[in-house]
Amino acid sequence: MRNCKELKHEKNGNVTEKIGKNKGKSKKVSKDESLLSFDLFLEGKEHSAYKFMGAHFVTENRKRGVRFTTWAPRSSKIYVIGDFNNWELKEEYSMKKINERGIWSLFLPKLEEGIKYKFAVVNECGNNTVYKADPYAFKSELRPNTASVLTKIKSFRWGDKRWLNKREKEGLDNKPMNIYELHLGSWKRKDGEFMTYEEISEVLVEYVKEMGYTHVEFMPINEHPLDASWGYQGVGYYSVTSRYGDLNGLKALINKLHKNNIGVLLDWVPSHFCKDEHGLFMFDGSPTYEYGAWWKANNEGWGTCNFDLGRPEVKSFLFSNAMYWINEFHIDGLRVDAVSNMLYLDYGREYGEWEPNIYGGNGNLEAIAFLKELNTIIKKEGKGAITVAEESTSWEGITKPVEEDGLGFDYKWNMGWMNDTLSYIELDPIYRKYHHNKMNFSMMYNYSEKFILPISHDEVVHGKKSLINKMWGDDWKKYAGLRLYASFMMGHPGKKLMFMGCEFGQFVEWREWEELQWNIIEEFDIHKKTQEYFKALNHFYLENSSLWSLDYEEEGFKWIDADNSEESVLSFIRIGKNKKEKLIFICNFTPEVYYDFKVGVPELGEYVEVFNSDSLEFGGAGNIMGDSILKATEESFKDFDYSIIVKVPPLGTLVLKVK
């Protein structure tokens, strides 16, 4: 007789109780009970678990139906319940435990697509039953309903082979990468309601292409119960959220983006999950997907639970999920959310609320190993798909190869650059000279990682103000400041990311419950001109390889004057692979026009203006050179043997090149 003990999160330490007397031994099963080996899954080495876990339409013993399979190691009994049995716990719908590691399975004939179902999971002691959505379901009910829905992964005719071949052959380090981050539920709406994936594709693809972005980044589109979580507190990791349609609708959107040479990145959350009763939390009545130690599992700051990244079956769940999005939906990359929460045992915890690792440090060794393995898998099997880390600390080696003891990400968000520069642009220009280092410090560590410069959704919500409203001054100065900031960002080494709405100067913060304020573009000329500015700036970036071909090489950037704090001016050169490709940036962070401003240049010759943020067509004051030509002289400046004299626009960026 089993020694029954009700299991829950332990205050200190992990749940270590073993199930059954015959540990590690699997009972013999008939062919119809288990057609697959679960060895890789149980070892944490399975990368396509979604192909056999969950609910799959199959034919067994000449009967068509659905094979249900789930993992619940401490459950004493599991029922499949749903529309087909009036949601009742009946013995004929009881799943069979096909090995002692907790794999349960059941074949039910004559079930059709669209039927709703759940797993009724009885705990080890048999005294409590929880009703769980299928962790591997491909479809879920629209919130607030919580059941899984039987659906097939239908065939889809992709037309993006050329794109995928190019992705596999060519990396992005020496290519332009300008990402448009968006939330599908609030980018645009139709009569106040969500648009379908197909409806979104009709307007999004053309807009992104016209605006000159190279990639879109979708905030999470797996199923999640709370709109206000924006998808970052998930339940259905394999369910495409039903808010906007079905699997093939999403595939159609991605296919169209690819056919228009636009890449697709996806925000992905392998760090933590929501505690909703129908989800992964305490799945079999005990800690299953989360850590057994409550201090380690509980994420107090977000009200969520942290994945147990050392548990083999959880690793298989997450590795397979990453490859699911890449293989089934042709996603070009995953932006891994909350990496700091994964790496640090003391993240968000006070002294005494956490325990050190076996070496006495605060690094989560299981998470470190998980991330290395994740990135190794994607590099080996992802056919050119990338990973991006949202990581806010100075942890070393985020983008260093795994073979060199790095974590193996392709890129890392530069949160330091973002925080420094945003705090600077909110300052009155009178005080900016005292904080000049906020604008030049990033180049001190720029080549320590492969960075993306992010202005993301997190910066324009929860009282942080919209990007335009962060700018100092009256309306004219705000829009001038926005143009200046965006052009400085475009000139700075690193790939780029901008959140939706920033490109036309939306004044209100982002609101996930309504669409962007598209109406202001037509109603107010300055918003139209701001949108035209971002379009011109994006295309200028695309057309000039010096802005992206050597982002991660020191020879791609050279300061002209990094230290002019008194006048709050930064000047630098961007250099392309072809050393003749040079652009000179002069960024003035004051509202004063600087006449007869001396700038060092790399060579003698005639210099012309190629971009000016103060142009009248963008809403500026018109302090432009036009067709004027500046002849360099042999008068030295700083480290340069030659110089020119220019007029620098107020709160503006002037970009020059040799004729």
UniProtKB/Swiss-Prot annotation:
Record-level GO BP terms: glycogen biosynthetic process
Pfam families: Alpha-amylase (PF00128), Alpha-amylase_C (PF02806), CBM_48 (PF02922)
EC number: 2.4.1.18
Reaction it catalyzes: Transfers a segment of a (1->4)-alpha-D-glucan chain to a primary hydroxy group in a similar glucan chain
InterPro entries from the UniProt entry: A-amylase/branching_C, Branching_enzy, GlgB, GlgB_N_E_set_prok, Glyco_hydro_13_cat_dom, Glyco_hydro_13_N, Glyco_hydro_b, Glycoside_hydrolase_SF
GO cellular component: cytosol
Domain of life (superkingdom): Bacteria
UniProt GO molecular function: 1,4-alpha-glucan branching enzyme activity; cation binding; hydrolase activity, hydrolyzing O-glycosyl compounds
Pathway the protein acts in: Glycan biosynthesis; glycogen biosynthesis
SMART domains with a match to the protein in the record: Aamy (SM00642)
Keyword Glycosyltransferase: yes
Active site per the UniProt annotation: D337, E390
Alphabetical keyword list: Carbohydrate metabolism, Glycogen biosynthesis, Glycogen metabolism, Glycosyltransferase, Transferase
Family statement: Belongs to the glycosyl hydrolase 13 family. GlgB subfamily.
Quaternary data: Monomer.
Entry protein name: 1,4-alpha-glucan branching enzyme GlgB
Organism: Clostridium perfringens (strain ATCC 13124 / DSM 756 / JCM 1290 / NCIMB 6125 / NCTC 8237 / Type A)
